């Protein structure tokens, strides 16, 4: 199986590479392939002739997007469309990564694939438009929505909390945002499994570590009582972009793939932190 991976230098892209080790993988980071350049994308896809294009590239600075709307839409919407259209031209399938932030957070229970998106921020609107461009491209397309990603590569909430704990508490964390923390390694393994299935039974899946928690609860689990964590409100955090208050995801469609469900978020976090501990000894 031949795979073109866009966004190979990001935190998910870097964990996808070992997960896809058994394939003929062609990874491109943003320096090697600017997905906003339609001509460059077409040339890369024509050269590789992949069975699958995986788009893990994104402009994911949620607050920064409020002041860089053109750039956010260029990457998250137009760039995704460029990859999907190029995939369609060579008969490749495309798997595109999206976000829980396409929802407005008013449901109050986990969102499934059948719930209607209502994005609140520039970032969220750009990601939702990217979904629509991919699904409307004519390619055999699959959108995976995930949430609150963390891994050892790149910047993420877990690494930020660990760094804050090293400096000493208290750490102030929002308690009125609830979501589904997801380890990039678990998501990468799920993606590797999905593209090996004969035909994904749905064009849209929610793929997250099971369960939900607030940012405050997540931070407390990360530090394990080593430093104090204090709850604050989203308003007190002073963030530019609006965020959904409750964006936990669940999947009504993943079981039909026959692939295992991802572990609970607590289990994934314990495994992640134990790997850090082992690396230090």
Residue ranges and their predicted role:
Residues 190-191, 197-239, 245:
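Mid/C-terminal beta-alpha module of Rossmann-like enzyme folds, strongest
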Residues 214-220, 232-281:
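Conserved C-terminal active-site "lid" loop/helix of NAD(P)H-dependent oxidoreductases
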Residues 21-43:
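Adenosine-cofactor binding site in Rossmann-like domains, unifying the SAM/SAH pocket
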Residues 1-20:
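N-terminal Rossmann NAD(P)H-binding glycine-rich loop of SDR-like oxidoreductase domains
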Residues 132-179, 185-186, 192:
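NAD(P)-dependent short-chain dehydrogenase/reductase
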Residues 6, 28, 56-57, 94-99, ...:
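SDR active-site strand-loop-helix element
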Residues 67, 74, 79-82, 102-144, ...:
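Catalytic helix-loop patch of NAD(P)-dependent Rossmann-fold dehydrogenases
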Residues 35-75, 86:
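NAD(P)H-binding glycine-rich loop region in Rossmannoid oxidoreductase-like domains
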């Amino acid at each position: 199986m031949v795979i073109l991976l866009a966004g190979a230098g990001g935190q998910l892209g870097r964990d996808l590479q070992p997960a896809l080790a058994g394939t003929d993988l062609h990874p491109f980071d943003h320096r090697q392939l600017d997905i906003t350049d339609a001509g460059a994308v077409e040339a890369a896809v024509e050269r590789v002739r992949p069975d699958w294009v995986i788009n893990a590239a994104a402009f994911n600075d949620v607050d920064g997007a409020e002041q860089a709307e053109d750039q956010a839409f260029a990457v998250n919407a137009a760039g995704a469309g460029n990859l999907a259209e190029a995939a369609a031209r060579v008969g490749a399938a495309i798997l595109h990564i999206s976000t829980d932030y396409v929802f407005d957070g008013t449901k109050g229970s986990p969102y499934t694939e059948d719930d209607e998106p209502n994005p609140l921020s520039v970032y969220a609107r750009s990601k939702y438009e990217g979904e629509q461009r991919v699904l409307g491209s004519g390619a055999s397309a699959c959108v995976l929505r995930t949430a609150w990603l963390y891994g050892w590569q790149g910047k993420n909430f877990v690494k930020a909390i660990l760094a804050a704990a090293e400096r000493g508490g208290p750490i102030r964390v929002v308690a009125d945002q609830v979501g589904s923390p997801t380890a990039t390694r678990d998501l990468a393994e799920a993606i590797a499994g999905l593209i090996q299935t004969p035909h994904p039974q749905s064009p849209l899946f929610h793929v997250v570590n099971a369960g939900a928690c607030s940012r405050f609860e997540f931070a407390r689990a990360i530090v394990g009582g080593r430093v104090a964590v204090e709850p604050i409100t989203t308003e007190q955090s002073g963030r530019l972009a609006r965020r959904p208050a409750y964006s936990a995801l669940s999947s009504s469609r993943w079981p039909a793939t026959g692939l295992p469900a991802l572990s609970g978020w607590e289990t994934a976090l314990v495994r992640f932190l134990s790997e850090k501990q082992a690396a230090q000894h």
